[in-house]
């Protein structure tokens, strides 16, 4: 089936050279200056890594706090022991429960974006792992969503912490903000993602780690980023 592209997509596509790599700020400004959609589009980054994810030591899963936030409200759910439920409810969390929430998930309830829990509840949550896992909602110590300091985790995810992981092709797909962010704020968030991926390089990754990086918005074509320029910016760019 032939995919029909919108008029604004074609306009942006005509401004982008498939062969040309753009400096990060140039790519951001080009995407921001294109025809506007009827909603606030999300800026996305797609990081192609030289990882064979069929091996466990080449799988990447981590989290990062975007210094300028995500631009979207994250609906947080917390599973904890019965004694803590009321305290966490008073902390401003959307959904809080214990074994009852696990049971609700088993029955199909998934109306949240991020699930946090404490280590003692993981054996209970494991029962719904087959439901949460494929949706990217299974808590993990690596991503900071399984922690003894649940209150700090709640604050971090509210501020703009997000999880990322490689897909089967070794690509990390993440957001870096909204189209109405300033170019500088989007660049700050992009550098934060890049740094985090470097810092969490899997032990099994040998030789060249990065292949390519692409930026796009929800409704735009992708722009290939000049990775060398991004590395130069990373050395000098302050996260204000």
From Swiss-Prot:
GO terms for molecular function: rRNA binding; structural constituent of ribosome. One of its GO terms (biological process) is translation. Gene3D superfamilies: 3.30.190.20, 3.40.50.790. Its main location: plastid. Keywords: Chloroplast, Plastid, Ribonucleoprotein, Ribosomal protein, RNA-binding, rRNA-binding. The keyword Transferase does not apply. Signal peptide: none annotated. CDD domains: Ribosomal_L1. It is found in: Plastid, Chloroplast. Transmembrane segments: none annotated. It comes from the Eukaryota. One of its GO terms (cellular component) is large ribosomal subunit. HAMAP family: Ribosomal_uL1_B. Part of the 50S ribosomal subunit. Belongs to the universal ribosomal protein uL1 family. Binds directly to 23S rRNA. Might be involved in E site tRNA release (Potential). This is Large ribosomal subunit protein uL1c. It comes from Cyanidium caldarium (Red alga). The lineage of its organism: Eukaryota, Rhodophyta, Bangiophyceae, Cyanidiales, Cyanidiaceae. The gene is rpl1.
